[in-house]
Amino acid sequence: MASQGEHALLGHSTVQPSERGKDSPVPYSPRASRAKNTPGQFPDPIIVSPHQEHKQTFIILHGRGSTAEKFAPPLLSITTPSGETLQTAFPHAKLIFLTASRNRATIYKRSLTHQWFDHWHMEAPSKRQELMRAGLRKSAGYVHGILEREIEEVGEENVVLWGLSQGCATSLIALLTWNGGPFAATVGMCGYLPFANHIEDIVKGGSEGDGDDVFGEDERDNDDNPFCNSGDENDSSNGFENNRITKQDLPTQAVTFLRDEIEMGDKAGMVFRDVPVFMGHGTEDEKVPIEMGREARTCLDLLGADVQMVEYEGLGHWYSEEMLGDMFDFLREKLCISQ
């Protein structure tokens, strides 16, 4: 694997394509790209300029505990079975590698780490789901802002949202809560969908998934929550007897639930149905079990999303040459790029 200094990587100030040859790497600038480690704040993204005229933008999110500075170099260096890299396959794409803010992680004794949101152990994804709310709201809002800016620059049909692991989970939440125009595609590696158990149950006509408390112990008696079952069973303001909810179709109810849960308002748009999704997942993933990826795909299917998932035999919690090759083919099709 090549060293970081060999990759086309810069911080906020990028080298323009005219300053180098078509296939020459941008010099790596550690000083320019070093993430600011102020807790709770998003560091400046690392931006990789396109090799040719800027026509597309890829917004890329790393996994929990990583940063853009760590995540970008290996992704830029890996080659597909046909010998392509991300930059040679998409020479017109600006690559924006985002870095999550540093926040306290509950399962790591509240130590500070870069994470898009806090969560409980992956072995029990339906437990302590209230931990995810604040981070998902903040991170999805941050991603929405980047999407808006890049769509304004190159057009919605030329913007891609991409994430690994927790970055994939955040990308999917950002997609489901997006109320702008449909962008080109979302791609995820080794990912999962937060609140998947509750979303699936709502779409299937249930009320609260498998019985686990989505809101946390301190909110079990919250009468203001339309999804809470703790009130009077004859009170039409509780559960799915609420008129505002029962007038909606089930997928819209699920998206409304998601938006309510992370406090993003109740304007439940369904734009995500017009944004194709590709998910790649290794069958031997030791951190995000493939069952969680399958659950995410099932939920997206039930919500009416255009989703495809490819499983990679023997692959652990990472991506492979084959996965990247499949993703490149998918993106070429959605971006209407011929090889």
Report each predicted region and the residues it spans.
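Serine-hydrolase catalytic machinery in alpha/beta-hydrolase-like enzymes
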Residues: 31-158
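The feature captures the conserved acid-bearing segment of alpha/beta-hydrolase catalytic domains
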Residues: 49-52, 180, 185, 191-337
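Short hydrophobic segments within beta-strands
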Residues: 59-61, 98, 162, 189, ...
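Gly/Ala-rich beta-loop-alpha elbow adjacent to hydrolase catalytic centers
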Residues: 162-167, 171
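Active-site signature of alpha/beta-hydrolase-fold catalytic machinery across serine-
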Residues: 173-177
